[in-house]
UniProtKB/Swiss-Prot annotation:
<keyword id="KW-0275">Fatty acid biosynthesis</keyword>
<keyword id="KW-0443">Lipid metabolism</keyword>
<keyword id="KW-0808">Transferase</keyword>
<dbReference type="GO" id="GO:0005737">
    <property type="term" value="C:cytoplasm"/>
</dbReference>
<keyword id="KW-0460">Magnesium</keyword>
<dbReference type="GO" id="GO:0008897">
    <property type="term" value="F:holo-[acyl-carrier-protein] synthase activity"/>
</dbReference>
<dbReference type="Pfam" id="PF01648">
    <property type="entry name" value="ACPS"/>
</dbReference>
<dbReference type="GO" id="GO:0000287">
    <property type="term" value="F:magnesium ion binding"/>
</dbReference>
<protein>
    <recommendedName>
        <fullName>Holo-[acyl-carrier-protein] synthase</fullName>
        <ecNumber>2.7.8.7</ecNumber>
    </recommendedName>
</protein>
<keyword id="KW-0444">Lipid biosynthesis</keyword>
<comment type="similarity">
    <text>Belongs to the P-Pant transferase superfamily. AcpS family.</text>
</comment>
<feature type="binding site">
    <location>
        <position position="8"/>
    </location>
    <ligand>
        <name>Mg(2+)</name>
    </ligand>
</feature>
<dbReference type="GO" id="GO:0006633">
    <property type="term" value="P:fatty acid biosynthetic process"/>
</dbReference>
<dbReference type="InterPro" id="IPR004568">
    <property type="entry name" value="Ppantetheine-prot_Trfase_dom"/>
</dbReference>
<dbReference type="InterPro" id="IPR037143">
    <property type="entry name" value="4-PPantetheinyl_Trfase_dom_sf"/>
</dbReference>
<comment type="function">
    <text>Transfers the 4'-phosphopantetheine moiety from coenzyme A to a Ser of acyl-carrier-protein.</text>
</comment>
<feature type="binding site">
    <location>
        <position position="57"/>
    </location>
    <ligand>
        <name>Mg(2+)</name>
    </ligand>
</feature>
Amino acid sequence: MILGIGTDLANIERIERTLDRFGDRFRNRVFTEIEQRKAERRSDTAGTYAKRWAAKEACSKALGTGLRMGISWKDMAVSNLRSGQPVMQVTGWAAERLREMTPEGYEAIIHVTLTDDHPWAQAFVVIEARPLAEVGEVNLTYPAPPRM
């Protein structure tokens, strides 16, 4: 079952201007160290940050709150599997909100997709609830997400 859907569109040039103006103050407030290392290795640094910004906004919307109620930007972090697939991890308040919205007997799975076409970066986040398998039962309908 779908628990939440969120989307966001970010202007790469706006993020680039913000990076130029505020530098590390902006980076350290919004992005985890892993996100920063990833972005700084890319030729399109601003585009990489913009996609992650959009993903955090989209995730907060999928959680049903937007960026309020004590949520921290760093409570939501985007990384990538070896295949390149983006994944969203939540900690702190965002993880607490996710636990609250997940029905008993289910596990929450966060799906995220990112794209960009200069000057735009876009993200979609879907939060899905999958039934937990009974002890000793194999849940073939809902395979486990890929391991990182």
